[in-house]
A protein has these predicted regions:
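N-terminal leader/targeting pre-sequences
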Residues: 2-137
Length: 137
């Protein structure tokens, strides 16, 4: 769940999510500006291959990933890939792990670290799925 969300200056917001579950550890950093969000991630001990990567609606961990509910979707769009014209705001595509590590960066529209935005990720769950995402296909 993104925490430590701060306004770095008058131009952008920044959030950090620490991952530490079932021996999978890592960090996901979000930086948002003008309705675009850049996500940098570094994950360790993740099985090799593609894994769906999403922001889910709720940050409730009481029942593990199940309590996170569906993908974050404030505009009620269909599921898609991170660069699809029509997509859930929380659709971040797939990350690829090799040698049990995954790191990279992605920039998407319609996500924000601003807690006042309808597209805010603050308090939501970040999930790295065991299986690949179909990107809405």
């Amino acid at each position: 769940m993104p925490n430590n969300c701060t306004k770095k200056n008058k131009k952008y917001y920044h959030c950090i999510s620490i991952i530490d579950m079932n021996n999978i550890k890592g960090i996901v950093k979000f930086k948002s500006y003008n309705n675009k969000c850049t996500i940098n991630y570094k994950i360790k001990n993740l099985s090799n291959g593609k894994h769906g990567f999403h922001v889910h609606k709720h940050g409730d961990l009481s029942q593990g990933c199940t309590s996170g509910c569906e993908h974050f979707n404030p505009d009620n769009h269909e599921h898609g890939g991170p660069h699809s014209k029509i997509r859930h705001a929380g659709d971040l595509g797939n990350i690829i792990s090799s040698n049990k590590e995954s790191f990279g960066s992605i920039t998407v529209n319609n996500l924000s670290c601003n807690p006042k935005s309808k597209c805010s990720i603050v308090g939501r769950m970040i999930i790295i799925h065991e299986d690949p995402d179909d990107l809405g296909k």
